[in-house]
Amino acid sequence: MPIDQIRDIVVRHGRLAASAADLTPTSDLYAAGLSSLTTVHLMLALEDAFDVEFPDRMLGRKTFESLQSIAEAIQELKAAA
């Protein structure tokens, strides 16, 4: 899963205090400023970009806590499609 593409979407839609350069694959996005409201915007942008739909079971904080966790979730959804 392209972490750089996910990073770009997170930076555009997450309204984080951290810059894109500061985000590693395992950086805590909530500690970087991601809120519940911006998580919804981020989720919708990710669904559009990757042509997936996050099921209810993936709508928790754990799915969106890092670039890596987002990539793993998208990879799982793509594999199941």
Region locations from a protein language model:
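Thiotemplate assembly-line natural product biosynthesis machinery
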Residues: M1-A20, A73-A81
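Short alpha-helical elements of helix-turn-helix
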Residues: D4, L37-V40
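Helix N-cap/coil-helix junction residues
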Residues: R15-L16, L34, V52
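Short, flexible turn/loop "capping" segments at secondary-structure junctions
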Residues: A21-L23, D51
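Glycine-rich loop motifs involved in handling phospho/adenylate chemistry
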Residues: T24-S35, P55-S66
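Phosphopantetheinylated carrier protein domains
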Residues: T39-T63
